[in-house]
Curated annotation (Swiss-Prot):
Keywords: Protein biosynthesis, Transferase. GO terms for cellular component: cytosol. Gene3D superfamilies: 3.40.50.12230. One of its GO terms (molecular function) is methionyl-tRNA formyltransferase activity. SUPFAM superfamilies: FMT C-terminal domain-like, Formyltransferase. It comes from the Bacteria. It comes from Mycolicibacterium smegmatis (strain ATCC 700084 / mc(2)155). Attaches a formyl group to the free amino group of methionyl-tRNA(fMet). The formyl group appears to play a dual role in the initiator identity of N-formylmethionyl-tRNA by promoting its recognition by IF2 and preventing the misappropriation of this tRNA by the elongation apparatus. (6S)-5,6,7,8-tetrahydrofolate binds at residues 110-113. Pfam families: Formyl_trans_C, Formyl_trans_N. The lineage of its organism: Bacteria, Bacillati, Actinomycetota, Actinomycetes, Mycobacteriales. Belongs to the Fmt family. The keyword Transferase applies. This is Methionyl-tRNA formyltransferase.
Length: 312
């Protein structure tokens, strides 16, 4: 089939690679978001998907307004049989959805109808899900609500960050997307409506939602930090200093040195503990402003923290 691939960030790359390498399909163009400012100098940089397309000599489509009359006409001229989508980053109008005869097939990183929305991987980890997955479905105007072609499941590990889990789902999801496109091409796949029960929503992660709430139970603090690692990164205030924090370890044994109130920090010879709504957690890494991630105990010694000090 003639395919247009729509995607932007790094997790879309395994899917694009598989479709480029497939002998059954021809990726005639790649749709991605316009170049965005990156780095300290803010110089515009092509998206990861754009860079891969350029390496393979595939025409790039980077409209500022993908639902404009001009772009609808441009896509119509390409006459794609199907459009495959992985994290493109924009809502699509009904006119655009109607262009390819087999529609737009999206790879979503959850087991729909669970975790519809922008941050399904983060939501699954924060909620303590033990199993998640990826779903291919037909895009329709309502958010992530279209009929399902296929799913693949993935175990959520106790130490998974969003980055870890997304990397695995990107690989297994790419294989699922290729199988789905193959099945649509040969007529062996039929989409099944999503159930009306079990719908949950995963809204976009905001800077404020990534702030650590030390008043929550330790296991919840742990999950919520891992859910926003590496991006945008969990953060907290220590005095007047805003720092990012990496994944933590729940450490009930630290209570032997006395209780810690939520947010209260205890600096040991080789450790930094913070109180939560239940048990203390041990900080692994801290990233001060303008610096790289570093060992939390090393940072605390260098910062010469004087107790009592708290995170908030």
């Amino acid at each position: 089939m003639r395919l247009v691939f729509a995607g932007t960030p790094e997790p879309a790359l395994p899917s694009l690679r598989r479709l480029i390498e497939s002998p059954r399909h021809d990726v005639v163009a790649v749709l991605t978001r316009p170049d965005a400012a990156a780095g300290r100098r803010g110089k515009p940089r092509p998206s990861p998907v754009a860079q891969l397309a350029l390496e393979h000599g595939i025409p790039l489509l980077r409209p500022d307004r993908p639902n404009s009359d001009e772009f609808v006409a441009e896509l119509t001229e390409l006459a794609p049989d199907c459009c495959a989508v992985v994290a493109y980053g924009a809502l699509l109008s009904q006119r655009l959805l109607a262009v390819p005869r087999h529609g737009w097939i999206n790879l979503h990183f959850s087991l729909l109808p669970a975790w519809r929305g922008a941050a399904p991987v983060q939501a699954a980890i924060a909620a303590g899900d033990t199993v998640t997955g990826a779903t291919t479905f037909q895009i329709e105007p309502a958010l992530d609500s279209g009929p399902v072609y296929g799913v693949v499941t993935e175990t959520v590990r106790d130490t998974d960050t969003a980055g870890d889990l997304l990397e695995r789902l990107s690989d297994s999801g790419a294989e699922l997307l290729e199988r789905t496109i193959d099945g649509i091409a040969d007529g062996s796949l039929t989409a099944v409506p999503q159930p009306s029960e079990g719908i949950t929503v995963a809204p976009k992660i905001t800077v404020e939602s990534a702030r650590v709430r030390w008043d929550l139970p330790a296991h919840v603090v742990d999950r919520r930090i891992r859910a926003v690692t590496p991006n945008p990164g969990a953060w907290t205030m220590i005095g007047e200093l805003r720092v990012k924090v990496g994944p933590v370890t729940v450490d009930q044994a630290a209570e032997a040195d006395g209780p810690l109130a939520p947010g209260e920090i205890r600096v040991g010879r080789n450790s930094v503990h913070v109180g939560t709504g239940s048990h203390p957690v041990r900080l692994g890494q801290i990233q001060p402003p303008g610096k790289k991630l570093m060992n939390a105990a090393d940072w605390a010694r260098g910062a010469r923290l004087e107790e009592p000090v708290s995170a908030s």
